[in-house]
UniProtKB/Swiss-Prot annotation:
InterPro entries: AAA+_ATPase (IPR003593), AAA_lid_3 (IPR041569), ATAD2-like (IPR045199), ATPase_AAA_core (IPR003959), ATPase_AAA_CS (IPR003960), Bromodomain (IPR001487), Bromodomain-like_sf (IPR036427), P-loop_NTPase (IPR027417). This is ATPase family AAA domain-containing protein 2. GO terms for cellular component: nucleus. The keyword Disulfide bond does not apply. It catalyses: ATP + H2O = ADP + phosphate + H(+). It comes from Pongo abelii (Sumatran orangutan). Its EC number is 3.6.1.-. Residues 811-923 form the Bromo domain. Keywords: Activator, ATP-binding, Bromodomain, Coiled coil, Hydrolase, Isopeptide bond, Nucleotide-binding, Nucleus, Phosphoprotein, Transcription, Transcription regulation, Ubl conjugation. Its main location: nucleus. The gene is ATAD2. PANTHER family: AAA DOMAIN-CONTAINING, ATPASE FAMILY AAA DOMAIN-CONTAINING PROTEIN 2.
Length: 1091
């Protein structure tokens, strides 16, 4: 309001001042007329040049008279017009430009009126005249032609007159922003009654253009750049997306054959993606749609993302390819309101346009969490948008959506239904066969390949290892082999020559790798399943086999999962289902498949479906439960039950022990118990493991006991949920409620017995007869390898390029040199047209200066420089500046500093040099100069000449002492010579190191800092003594140990085994084992069960 009043007051003041000036001018003219200063001739001459001004004066006088006559009425009407003028101020200001443009027209009209002699004495003076509203018409947008940026241009065109451009993105004061905003509002609002349809159309055009630009940012990962040239160019113009467009680089070598242990999941993905493309007639016949969504869930490192990558590569093969889009969970999230939903819509639109396509959401729990009242509303909006896009009113067509998560409970339940995520694939820990297959995949490129029996044993020991853990073990084993064979590489930063054939991975490398790495599944919670160790396996393997045999009678599914005697012809996982692939005749379900009589009979007395009632198709059990009972120390909880669970590792195991119930303070024990049993029912067949149930039952309260028994009773009778428990008390000593859970008559009780004589003999035989008689470890081979001096490896040879690659490379290099020549011509032209440097544009005439050739050996001028540019003699700017320096040095050398003319030439030569350097420094990009030098070096190595691309018919008139002939200084191709790499030094063998330990070799070995030479030579020079072992005494000691341990339990046997092992470790360096045998006999005799 203050601003509007200020404008109004200022306008009135200006008009009042103009009226006063015109009055004074009119009064002066009257005085001159009264004095008779002008005669008629002068008056006519004056009117000839001041006719327009006099007309203006006359009009001003008339208006002034009218204003004086109507001043009273104007003051009365001022109050009435005040509100109208205030409301029109903004419009009047907006029309200032139009009024200024129309002033000339108004003046012409007034002139014509005055010439006719018509004067309106009754006309009143007004500040503004309202005009008719002129509606805004949007001008046609002219296409903007973006000039291609020059690769060598990084500054102004001239160092003398630099160009400055005001950047609109620079910081400005708030006052300037406010003034610009107000000025834009004044000049952009032509009329208050303009229609809003124009703005809406403009907004729609902008939104459409923005949408098209944003869609081009979403490109599939499995398409190459040359396959999407148009889209890729648009994307490069647009720039980076708000989301992470390339969250990971897609490894094209990962295929379905690189995924082990997940054949069922791969077959299901083929049904969803591959089969609809290959066999569309099948789906067309039954008018069905294949599943369009699946959810991968499971612990980290089990292959969820790996399967997605393999699927992307499989979809990239063949004629009809599938576009694969990959997004991480938080890629679509944005701080701007509505931007996340917009990116999701754009993603699905782009996938629909490039259908068939796949959208893979990694870590989808971060994108679509469970909606709740305590959650931020932005996530609820994103989840709602994703739900509508996956299965809303608009069909998403041939778009398959795959989600991966580690937390299935954190995903919104609305996503987990058919139509959105039709299938859910559990990526559990791999079993023995899957681990063996994964090991084969990671070691199939090794030379030599490991034995199949070794891989089977390794897979058996890798319990709880995931696919990522197994891959890490293979890599760590290879590093252990490298560290063992060549320890020298860890003491130097230079690359040494290695004999790759001497690096062999052994079993001990895998042992060291497994000791170093802890599986991810065992870092937080240790898996209950664990195979018997090699130490106790001879002692307890028979007991484990008996438990499994008893378990198969109670839980027939165990036989189904542990039986590996499938025919090799039908080993395909798709043929494991007897119900789906049986050859039994089944009645037809079609109307025309049965006669009328048989159809009526089928409707009355025949059932088509036999769900859970056919014993031939699947095993059946009634409330499977088993209790392993033994005395304390029999190993039922520490060895036997984990071994049984390991044998049944294909089943999902849920542990319900004391730490699980009371370890989490956020939930009550009853809630934890209910959740465990609920999950066991959902993932049946499964196992509920309750270790030490006698202690468990004494600690928990009555509420948890009632909850546990009630949940067990609510499990269906034929549900394959096994309850496995262990107890250190006999069945009769347990509480009555526990006894009712396990019935002895049903074979649900297994009593553990003490190991027999044969098991104990196998248990101690290896320790006493083999390990006690083993000679000390020799390290001479390791010392020889440490003394080996490895030569420095030569630089790697460049990869030989094919003819097509060489051609493409030369074309790229020639494009770069073309830019260089254009730049050098521009610089030379700017120097040549300068009048100061006209003397250097042409060669020196020998007729005018006869002694010039004798003084200057290498003449040079700007015309010769232009000729060398045309002949492709300049590969870098340094070569060009070298000739500029030559022009300057020749001028300084030939023109002495005596004559004023010579001084002027010397001055202009220095100015030429400085100007050339200044222009190049100002306008040349440093990266472009470095690129030219690299190309020059590459051409020298390849032996490629730059004259190959020079003009074919570029002839120059021969001149004596031409600078183009024999110019060795300025030709970059003749300045340097290729450097041949030195021949590598032959690697010496360890035996040669020992036989010839010279002073130089000694210093090289000491620089490696692996072992001192004196100590190494002392170890190698020591003779190997003979081994002294009394095998008869060892056999007698074994018999004594077996006899004494007749009534020992598992813990006591392990204790005795540890005592004997300590004796062997203390005498591990002795070649005479007599003292060791005496020590073992003494320890066995003093060993007591009370320990």
């Amino acid at each position: 309001m203050l601003f509007d009043k200020l404008i109004t007051n200022t306008a009135e003041a200006v008009l009042q001042k103009m009226d006063d000036m015109k009055k004074m001018r009119r009064q002066r003219m009257r005085e001159l007329e009264d004095l008779g200063v002008f005669n008629e001739t002068e008056e006519s001459n004056l009117n000839m040049y001041t006719r327009g001004k006099q007309k203006d004066i006359q009009r001003t006088d008339e208006e002034t008279t009218d204003n004086q006559e109507g001043s009273v009425e104007s003051s009365e009407e001022g109050e009435d017009q005040e509100h109208e003028d205030d409301g029109e101020d903004e419009d009047d200001e907006d029309e200032d430009d139009d009024d200024d443009d129309d002033d000339d027209d108004d003046d012409d009209e007034d002139d014509e009126d005055e010439e006719d002699g018509e004067e309106d004495n009754q006309k009143r003076y007004y500040l503004r005249q309202r005009k008719a509203t002129v509606y805004y018409q949007a001008p046609l947008e002219k296409p903007r032609h973006q000039r291609k940026p020059n690769i060598f241009y990084s500054g102004p065109a001239s160092p003398a007159r630099p160009r400055y451009r005001l950047s609109s993105a620079g910081p400005r004061s708030p006052y300037c922003k406010r003034m610009n905003r107000r000025r834009h509002a004044i000049h952009s609002s032509d009329s208050t009654s303009s229609s809003s349809s124009e703005d809406e159309q403009h907004f729609e055009r902008r939104r459409k253009r923005s949408r098209n630009r944003a869609i081009n940012r979403y490109l599939p990962l499995n398409f190459r750049k040359d396959e999407l040239k148009g889209i890729y160019k648009d994307r490069m113009k647009i720039g980076a997306s708000l989301a992470d467009v390339d969250p990971m680089q897609l490894d094209s070598s990962v295929r379905f054959d690189s995924v082990g242990g997940l054949s069922n999941h791969i077959a299901a993905l083929k049904e969803m993606v591959v089969f609809p493309l290959l066999y569309p007639e099948v789906f067309e016949k039954f008018k069905i749609q294949p599943p369009r969504g699946c959810l991968f869930y499971g612990p980290p490192g089990t292959g969820k993302t790996l399967v997605a990558r393999a699927l992307a590569n499989e979809c990239s093969q063949g004629d009809k390819r599938v576009a694969f889009f990959m997004r991480k969970g938080a890629d679509c999230l944005s701080k701007w309101v509505g931007e996340s939903e917009r990116q999701l819509r754009l993603l699905f639109d782009q996938a629909y346009q490039m259908r068939p396509s796949i959208i893979f959401f990694d870590e989808i729990d971060g994108l679509a969490p469970v909606r709740s009242s305590r959650q931020d509303q932005i996530h609820s909006s994103i989840v709602s948008t994703l739900l509508a896009l996956m299965d809303g009113l608009d069909s998403r067509g041939e778009i398959v959506v795959i989600g991966a998560t580690n937390r299935l409970d954190a995903i919104d339940p609305a996503l987990r239904r058919p139509g959105r995520f039709d299938r859910e694939f559990l990526f559990s820990l791999p079993d023995k066969e899957a681990r063996k297959e994964i090991l084969k995949i990671h070691t199939r490129d090794w030379n030599p390949k490991p034995l199949d029996t070794f891989l089977e044993e390794l897979a058996e020991n890798c319990v709880g290892y995931r696919g990522a853990d197994i891959k890490s073990i293979c890599a760590e084993a290879a590093l252990c082999a490298l560290r063992r064979r060549y320890p020298q590489i860890y003491t130097t930063s230079e690359k040494l020559q290695l004999d790759l054939s001497s690096i062999n991975i052994s079993a001990k490398d895998f042992e060291v790798a497994m000791q170093k790495m802890i599986p991810a599944s065992q870092r937080a919670v240790t898996s209950p399943g664990q195979a018997l160790s090699t130490v106790v396996k001879p002692l307890l393997q028979n007991t484990v086999d008996k438990i499994l045999e008893a378990l198969q009678r109670v839980f027939p599914h165990a036989e189904f999962r542990t039986n590996k005697t499938l025919d090799s012809d039908i080993s395909c996982p798709l043929l494991e289902s007897d119900l789906a692939y049986s050859d039994d005749d089944v009645p037809s379900v079609y109307e025309n498949g049965l006669s009328q009589k048989s159809s009526h009979k089928a409707k009355d007395n025949f059932n088509f479906l036999h769900l859970n009632r056919n014993a031939c198709y699947q095993p059946m059990s009634f409330r499977p439960r088993i209790l392993i009972v033994g005395e304390p120390g029999f190993g039922q909880g520490s060895h036997l039950a984990p071994a049984v669970i390991h044998a049944l590792e294909k089943f999902t195991v849920y542990t319900l022990d004391i730490p699980v119930l009371f370890g989490v303070s956020a939930t009550s024990p009853e809630e934890t118990c209910a959740q465990v049993i609920r999950e066991a029912k959902r993932t049946a067949p499964s196992i509920v493991y309750v270790p030490h149930i006698h202690v468990w039952w004494e600690i928990v309260g009555p509420t948890l006991k009632a909850t546990f028994t009630t949940l067990l009773q609510n499990i269906p009778s034929f549900a394959p949920v096994l309850l496995l428990a262990t107890s250190d008390k006999s069945h009769s000593a347990l509480p009555e409620e526990v006894q009712e859970l396990f019935i002895r008559d049903y074979g649900e009780i297994f009593n553990v017995q003490l190991p027999g004589k044969e098991e104990r003999t196998k248990f101690f035989e290896d320790l006493i007869l083999k390990q006690a008689a083993k000679p000390p470890i020799s390290k001479k081979k390791a010392v020889l390898q440490a003394l080996e001096v490895l030569p420095v490896a030569p630089p790697p040879e460049p990869r030989s390029l094919t003819a097509e690659e060489v051609k493409r490379l030369e074309e790229q290099e020639e494009d770069t040199f073309r830019e260089l020549r254009i730049f050098l011509r521009n610089v030379t032209h700017r120097l040549a047209i300068d009048k100061r440097f006209r003397v250097f544009t042409k060669p020196v005439d020998p007729d005018e200066v006869p002694d010039y050739v004798t003084v200057i050996k290498q003449p040079m001028d700007l015309s010769s420089v232009i000729s060398k540019i045309d002949l492709h003699k300049y590969l870098t700017v340094k070569d060009y500046l070298r000739d500029i320096d030559l022009i300057c040095s020749n001028a300084l050398e030939y023109n002495p500093d005596r004559d004023p003319g010579d001084r002027l030439i010397r001055h202009r030569a220095c100015a030429l040099r400085d100007t050339a350097y200044a222009i190049i420094k100002e306008e040349l990009d440093e990266d472009f100069e470095q690129l030219c030098e690299e190309i020059q070096e590459s051409r020298k190595k390849r032996g490629c000449s730059s004259s190959k691309y020079a003009p074919s018919y570029y002839h120059v008139m021969p001149k004596q002492n031409s600078t183009l002939v024999g110019d060795k200084r300025s030709d970059p191709e003749q300045n340097e010579k290729l450097k041949t790499p030195s021949t590598p030094v032959a690697c010496s063998t360890p035996e040669m190191c020992v036989l010839r330990m010279t002073r130089a070799r000694r210093s090289q070995v000491e620089q490696q800092q692996l072992i001192s030479v004196e100590k190494a030579l002392a170890i190698l020079s020591q003779p190997t003594p003979s081994l002294v072992v009394d095998h008869e005494r060892l056999k007698n000691l074994l018999k004594t140990v077996v006899k004494k341990s007749r009534n020992y339990n598992i813990f006591q046997l392990e204790n005795l085994y540890a005592v004997i092992s300590q004796c062997i470790y203390q005498h591990r360096k002795d070649y005479d084992k007599t003292s060791l045998i005496q020590k073992m006999e003494q320890e066995v005799e003093n060993f007591s069960c009370s320990r």
